[in-house]
Amino acid sequence: GGPDGGNYYWTTSEDEPDLIYEWIDIENEATQLNFPHNDEFSSEQISLPFDFYYFDASYNYLDVNANGWVGWNSSNETVWENGNIPSSSMPRPAIFGYFDDLNPENDNSNSSSSGDIYYHVNEDRAVIWFDDVVRWEGEAGAGTYDFQIVLYSDGKFKCNYREMTGTTNQATIGWQNGLGTEGTQLSTVGESFVSNNFTWEAKTFSTASITWLTLTSDDGSLNGSLAGNESANIYAQVVTSDLEQGDYTAAINITSPDADPVAVSVTLTVT
C-alpha cells in the first residue's frame, strides 16, 4: 500500500512473497528497559549508532512507550486510549507496533502487570522487543503479546509478531508524523490485522538514488491525462553495468487525483 504523505509504502508477509517473517533473536544480548508508569516512556532513552530519517526529520535516539509504540520526544506521550491516525490527539511522531492500553512491568505496577520490554542496537538496526506484555484487562478482554519493532539505518521500519494471544482487534497499528497530519493506519479499534508469525514493513523509495531504472513513454512524457478505457505505454529500462552483485528493489508510482495510487514493485538480481 501507499504512498502516504511521507512517501512511505508498506506491505505484509501475507501479501508480498519476498517479505518473509523472520524474528530477530536478541534474547542473549538485549538490555531491559525500565518504566516509571505503564503509560509513559521508559526511563532510558536509546542512543542510535546511525541517523534515522523519518518524514522530514532525522534522529539519533529513540524513545520507547509502554503502550506498544516508539517515538521521539513525542507529544501526547501518556495517551493510553488509542484511536484513528493520523491525528493530532494521538502520540506524535510515532511508529505504532501495537498501540493499545498495555500493562508491562513498571514502577507503578499493579498485580495484573506482566511482561518486559528489551532492546538491542547495532550499526544496521535497532530492535525493540515487547516480550509477552499483557493488555490492561477491560471490557474488550485480556491479551498477551510477543512482538518487536525494528528500525533500520536506511530509514526502513518493520514489525514482527511472534505470538499474539487473546484480544487482538483493539490496537492501532501504523505510523504518523510529528504534527499528526500525515501517516498510515494499518489497523485500528475493532479491526483484526496481525497474527502469529506475521510481519509488515514500511519504507520510502527515492527516485534520485535509483540510477539503474529509467522510465520512458512513446511521446517522452510521464505525465498526462487518460479518458475512460484509454491506455498508454510506459517503458522501464534497466541498466546493470555499474551495479555490484546483489538484490535491488524499486517501485514505479502511479498517482492520480481521481483514483487510488498504485505502486508497481521492481525487483532486480545481479549475479
What are these regions (language model features)?
Residues Y61-N65, I234, V264:
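Short capping micro-motif at the N-terminus of alpha-helices
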Residues D242-V270:
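Terminal connector regions
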Residues N73, T216, T269-T271:
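Small disulfide-bonded, cysteine-rich extracellular recognition modules and tandem repeats
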Residues G1-T211:
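Extracytoplasmic Ser/Thr/Pro-rich, glycosylation-prone low-complexity segments
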Residues I46, K203-F205, G220, G224, ...:
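Generic detection of short hydrophobic beta-strand segments and adjacent strand-loop junctions
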Residues D132, E163, V238-T240, V270:
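Short beta-strand segments enriched in hydrophobic/aromatic residues
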Residues D56, I128, L213, N229-A232, ...:
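Extracellular/surface recognition and adhesion modules
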